[in-house]
Amino acid sequence: VSKNGKVLYSIYDKGSYNIALLDKIFYIEDDFVGYGEDYNSNNELNPPIVELNNSKSKTYEDQFPNMFIMPKLMMDYGTLKPGFYFSSSEIINRLSLFGGASVNKLNDVDLFFIFDFKRFYPTIYFETYYLTRNTTDNSLYQGAYPINDDIKFRLVQFRSGLKLPFYGSLFDLSVTRQWYRAFIQEEVMTNEYGVLEAGAAYDYFRGWSINSAWSFNVVKNTLDKSINPSKGFSLSTLLDLEKNDFIEGLNLSDSGTLLEEFKPNNLARFQINGTYHYELPWEKRWTVSLKTHAGWISDQSVDPFFHFYLGGMPGIRGYPFYAIQGTNSALFDAIFRIPVFREKHYKFKWMIFQNSTLGAIFQAGDAWVDNFSMKRSLGIQWRLNGFSFYNFPTAIELEYHQPLDKFDKEINEEKITYGEKGRAYLKILFDF
């Protein structure tokens, strides 16, 4: 409030906050407001601040709230996987911690930890991931002796880097170290010697990479931006220089210990992504989103382990994840969305739903080594977002996709046909 009675305030209008100025003040009679005469009797009558505040400043000290821990329950490849998330953030977000852990009845473990340090101009971050997977395999030795294999895979990754803002965009420079290891425990049932046991452990992948990424996002901020973006575009590029050692075989040393034989698979990997959002002028919040992706690997003869995979949820969703692969990739994605409801407050148990949309999706693209062959898919999408337990963002997405093109692949001398069946996807996350 200025000396001459003008009021400067913020007002929320058309999906954004704006600064407004009230030139004249009109007093409203208490009878029209609806409050009793003693409504303000308990408020402290503090005088307005009209003099310079001479309080002495002091250096800010980090302040942390208590660690937040939230249990979780996942259904992962047919098994229940209970676990928890933990997080804590400094009051003004100068430092944050986030991690999680889960395990299932097969002793498959998922652990991750993310640390962000934001005291300097660049954000310094560190990430680590630790995963194990257990499986079994049965076979016959010389067609007579049954062999039971207990197989365990362990995946470890460390990543550290800097995030640098630059004229509205963001550079991300990082170094990644990862290695994968396998453990095999065999049991052979024989008539002569009973049960024979043997085991082995070996690394099958070791890799270093230097990563540089750039992203630029000018998508308009609206109340339903996450569920139904309507205006603006985003661009991102990623360049990885990778030094990869991938297992080619196993051998024995002079002392009889197991040795891995690695083959170099060094490469440069480049990717570019773009998204454009547009709101149709004749209907409110009817939107079209266009997405493109292109990728290239410098070594066209690299092992398929390092290929782009363009099926499943991150790619053409009418096909399984491993169905489409290659050293080159291209994808076009068009989504048309209409709102079911907007800015509502529907309560259901511990959840509050605010926005919902229906969408139609068309996808086309391929990942290839020698020849490009178009794969297409049509899908429908339903989205719902809001909050759980009054505080936690909740985003629910259900999709069904039908492939339009059939093709065959030969894997282990077996022909597999893709494109005959549709696929459904359900996601429940904090955001879309």
Predicted regions and their residues:
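Transmembrane beta-barrel wall of Gram-negative outer-membrane proteins
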Residues: D149-M189
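Outer-membrane beta-barrel initiation region
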Residues: Y17-N18, D23-T128, A213-F216, K220-S230, ...
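Residue position within the beta-strands of beta-propeller blades
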Residues: V7-S10
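Outer-membrane beta-barrel transmembrane domain signature of Gram-negative proteins
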Residues: G194-I227, P314-A323, S329-F332
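C-terminal transmembrane beta-barrel domains of outer membrane proteins
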Residues: K81, Y85-S87, S96-T136, Y141-D149, ...
